[in-house]
Amino acid sequence: MSRRGTAEEKTAKSDPIYRNRLVNMLVNRILKHGKKSLAYQIIYRAVKKIQQKTETNPLSVLRQAIRGVTPDIAVKARRVGGSTHQVPIEIGSTQGKALAIRWLLGASRKRPGRNMALKLSSELVDAAKGSGDAIRKKEETHRMAEANRAFAHFR
């Protein structure tokens, strides 16, 4: 048994303007080369664009988008007796949110155009409506898990 104590679980900090943890998680995932101020600029511009497009509370749109993209179940490769099986596993809420944010950012990076704030806002609005690449990714993951349900006992 380990003699070291268990590590305390860190809670995500909230961002300075909206006091929202999801915004801060988004900022930390969009961050490149340590340029956090640029990441904040992109997020805040995207939030303003959402406000202009939908004329509703942009944070509720963000929450709705992340809730819509968050997967309940995923598949994990597990090697059993010389062959690799895709085993469906349940995902916790924190890990699910992290995956959702990663998928949303990936989908918005793939969108055509130059401005990341515009691409991100479009993807978030689409995800809140129930369409877009990130939603398709979630559905694909759920389909994979459903197809490999026979291997669930390998967990």
Curated annotation (Swiss-Prot):
GO terms for cellular component: chloroplast; small ribosomal subunit. Its main location: plastid. One of its GO terms (molecular function) is structural constituent of ribosome. GO terms for biological process: translation. InterPro entries: Ribosomal_uS7 (IPR000235), Ribosomal_uS7_bac/org-type (IPR005717), Ribosomal_uS7_CS (IPR020606), Ribosomal_uS7_dom (IPR023798), Ribosomal_uS7_dom_sf (IPR036823). This is Small ribosomal subunit protein uS7c. It holds the Pfam family Ribosomal_S7. One of the primary rRNA binding proteins, it binds directly to 16S rRNA where it nucleates assembly of the head domain of the 30S subunit. PROSITE patterns: RIBOSOMAL_S7. It is found in: Plastid, Chloroplast. Part of the 30S ribosomal subunit. Belongs to the universal ribosomal protein uS7 family. It comes from Saruma henryi. Keywords: Chloroplast, Plastid, Ribonucleoprotein, Ribosomal protein, RNA-binding, rRNA-binding.
